[in-house]
Each structure stands twice: as structure tokens, then as C-alpha cells.
């Protein structure tokens, strides 16, 4: 059984959830939210190493069929980007949880482990071998029959996603025997931070389009997972106003992340609608996409986006320091994201804080692609993009309700705001922030003000 709904521990809600509360939260995800998979997050996060075992034991006591109908899937730190010992301790925690689940229930609670920020085959090979070695050691010393968890590569960079076939092929070569399938995780958020909304959205659509031919060439079934949240910049698939469109735009998925904001910042009825929309569009064939033309646009859009962001990097960093943390994550100043443009490398916050910071500056981050959109419109190529991304215009229209040129000018520049307005004129979008949200935007920034805007939007970032 391959899970369809992956409940996550993302800090995109305005509600604070501590690591201690995440054990009970996992059981609620299974029973109340209908998720069949819970992702325990160790990437840039101080999650206790006992959490997988604690959830396993509590699920057993509650009579939940963990490892049969419900699954636990840790996301480990990437040993290339974080401390090596944290990566290894996460693997240890996963195998130890399986030891207990086999003893208690006769089956493994953890069938998969997610490796994030995958860009190279060497790290995939290292983690794969360590999983084998650690599992073999437990079998030898305890006599308990265990299977090593399978590795899920999480690719979170637009350029790397376009080379997903090479990464999958490289992983298969590391394996002693060919598996029946691979779950491929495509992340929207970090890709958007690095390359912008336009490039990251096109890259995922293009990658999904290629999967059928990749399956044929490699002789293996691929089950794509979409890592997306509520704001359009982060995929929009959890958004009650957009999910019915995003599930069509990103068709070809098998599993979707159900992040914190859609569970805690929307009504339960809204959540159910999002859940059913995701499930109803699951597992359909991906769309045919004209890849060569799109790859050229992806490269150009990414380059233009980066040149915009580095101009306002200091403002983003200042605002990011005001964004409240709603999970026990490591500070983005320690584990952040780098953007390189114009011979300058800038350290940016992780995706949720980054997204929230742009909204707090009166400029939804999807609008950072305005120079590219205007150029595409003038060169009669915008229709090509809108065909590949049929939800795009609706996403911009949705985000326009959180846009205030006056506030955006104060944090960015009048010249850039003019380009944003020109883009919206091309698209015939006249909506702007008004009423309560506009009042909040024009107040002084502090944590309470940012949380209030997040509650209004129904997501922090």
C-alpha cells in the first residue's frame, strides 16, 4: 500500500505545536484528518530521537494498525548540509522504532525514510548503505527480523528536478537488487525560494510529465509525492480556494503533503473539501508538456528572479527576524538557504519564514516574477506558460488581495512596484488589499501583527 496523504510537521500555521505535542498530533492525523502517513521531521528541526518509538507505542496502545494501514516516515537531515551525527541518529531512531513495532505488532511502522535536498548521487548512496548496515546490525544482535526502510529522494531544486531521471537511475545502480517501485518526492517551497514561483512550478509540471517515459526506460514504477503548502508560492495545493485548480495543474501525483496550516488555520469542513479534492485527483496520468521551450523559460525566469531578490535581501532578512516560529525548528540563520546572483551569495530564511516575510512587506512572493511575466507578455510567450500552468492567473488574482503598492514600495522600491502593477494590468487583475487586511498591512510590524495577517490569510507562510 502506498499512502495518499502525508501529514507533516511544517511550521506554516499560526498555531504553535511543540515537539512534545507532536506524538498526540500524529494519532489525530490518522484518526481525525484521515492521513495514512505522518512525516516526522528532523531536517533543521530539534525533534526528539525518541519520537518515532513514542508514536509507535502510542499507536499500538490505541489499536491503530501502524505499518499496515498507517505509516510513519521520518525526514532525516541531509548529511551533506547538516551535522553528520544528526543524520545517523535519525536513521538509528527509525530502525529502533521498527524494532519495537515488530516486537509489539509483528510489522514495521517505518517503511520509508525521506532524504531532503537531494542534488547528488553520492549522498543517496551513502544513506542507502548506512540504512543497510544499521539494519543488519540490529538483526544480528537482536534476532528480530527487520527490513531496511526504503529511501525516498526529496528533490527541492528546479534544476535538479529536471534531472530527476539521472538521480533515480543513479540510486538504482547503488542497490543490490532492483526494487518494484520508487517514491519520488518533489518539493515546491525550497525550489521557489531559490528560483521563484514561475520556474519552480514549471519544473515540477515538466518533471511529472517526464515520469511516464522514465518509468519505461528504467523499468520501474514511480510514485510521485508533491511537497506543497497553502500559499501559491509553496504550491497552493492545501489552499481551500485553490486546491481544485492545483490538483489539475500538478496532475500525475500519487501522494500529497497535508501541512499544518490547512489543518489548524482553516475550518474542519474546509479541510475535508481540500482532502477530498486531493484524493479525487490522485493517480491520474500527467499532462503532455513541451519540455524544450519550457526549460528555456525556467532558466530565464530563475535568473531574473534571483537578480530581484538580491536587491532586497537586507529587507527580507530584517522582516524574517520578526516571523514567529510555530515548531521547534533550528533558526534559519543556522540552517537557511543560499541564493547566488550577480556574484553575490545571500543567506535567506527557509521557505515558510521567507514566504511570510514577503507577505508582511505587502508583496506576495509570486509577484517577484513580474519582470519575467512582462517580458513574456511582450514577446507573445505568456500563453505558452499559461497553458503549462493553467492555475497561474488565478494564483496571481488570489495573491492580489494581499498586495498593497504603498506598503510594497516602502519595503522594496517604487520602480519594482511599477513593474508589478504593469504585470497585473497585462493580466487584467484589479484586485488589491482592502478592509481589515489593508489596515493590518499598514500597521507597525511586530509578531502579533504578523500572526494576525497570517490568521486572515489562513496560513503563516
Swiss-Prot record:
Keyword Plastid part of the UniProt annotation: no
UniProt-listed InterPro entries: PEP_COase_arc-type (IPR007566), Pyrv/PenolPyrv_kinase-like_dom (IPR015813)
Membrane-spanning ranges: none
Known cofactor(s): Mg(2+)
The keyword Translocase is annotated on this UniProt entry: no
Reaction(s) catalysed by this chain's protein: oxaloacetate + phosphate = phosphoenolpyruvate + hydrogencarbonate
Biological process (GO), any one: carbon fixation
Enzyme class: lyase
EC nos: 4.1.1.31
Keyword vocabulary terms for this entry: Carbon dioxide fixation, Lyase, Magnesium
Domain of life: Archaea
Molecular-function GO term, any one: phosphoenolpyruvate carboxylase activity
Summary of the function given for this chain in its UniProt record: Catalyzes the irreversible beta-carboxylation of phosphoenolpyruvate (PEP) to form oxaloacetate (OAA), a four-carbon dicarboxylic acid source for the tricarboxylic acid cycle.
Family, similarity comment: Belongs to the PEPCase type 2 family.
Quaternary structure, from the entry: Homotetramer.
Entry protein name: Phosphoenolpyruvate carboxylase
Taxonomic lineage of the native organism: Archaea, Thermoproteota, Thermoprotei, Thermoproteales, Thermoproteaceae
Gene name for this UniProt entry: ppcA
